Amino acid sequence: MLEQEQASYRVERINELIRRELTLLLRTSIKDPRLRDMIITDVLISRDLSSAKVFYTVIKEDKKMIEPLLDKASGFFRIHLSKTIDLRHTPVLRFIFDSAPNTGARIEQLLSKL
């Protein structure tokens, strides 16, 4: 049981580290202004650390415009992560739009009208 808890803790720590590094990268190194309005909401790495789902939301831009940009930049993100995070293999990143923040804002807007 202890080994499983340690493995789970390690995965959570890596998730947070990847989220933090990608957020920093978006704020400091990405020149495309459309990607600067993006927020990384969560990262879920697989147990074998080979792939990671990166959940994001956007403030101003249309998500359909952002998805191809993220797919194109995923190699750049992986290279950066390989230099900053000490892992045997850098995970393959898959970006997934997170609609939860938008849904929450819509619910708040509807409740304020009551």
Swiss-Prot record:
NCBIfam families tied to this protein: rbfA
Phylogenetic lineage: Bacteria, Pseudomonadati, Pseudomonadota, Gammaproteobacteria, Candidatus Pseudothioglobaceae
Molecular function terms from GO: ribosomal small subunit binding
InterPro entries: KH_dom-like_a/b, RbfA, RbfA_dom_sf, Ribosome-bd_factorA_CS
Repeat is among the record's keywords: no
Cellular compartments per GO CC: cytosol
Compartment annotation: Cytoplasm
Main location class: cytoplasm
Species this chain originates from: Vesicomyosocius okutanii subsp. Calyptogena okutanii (strain HA)
Function according to Swiss-Prot or TrEMBL: One of several proteins that assist in the late maturation steps of the functional core of the 30S ribosomal subunit. Associates with free 30S ribosomal subunits (but not with 30S subunits that are part of 70S ribosomes or polysomes). Required for efficient processing of 16S rRNA. May interact with the 5'-terminal helix region of 16S rRNA.
Name of protein: Ribosome-binding factor A
Subunit structure of this chain's protein: Monomer. Binds 30S ribosomal subunits, but not 50S ribosomal subunits or 70S ribosomes.
Keyword Mitochondrion found: no
Superkingdom classification of source: Bacteria
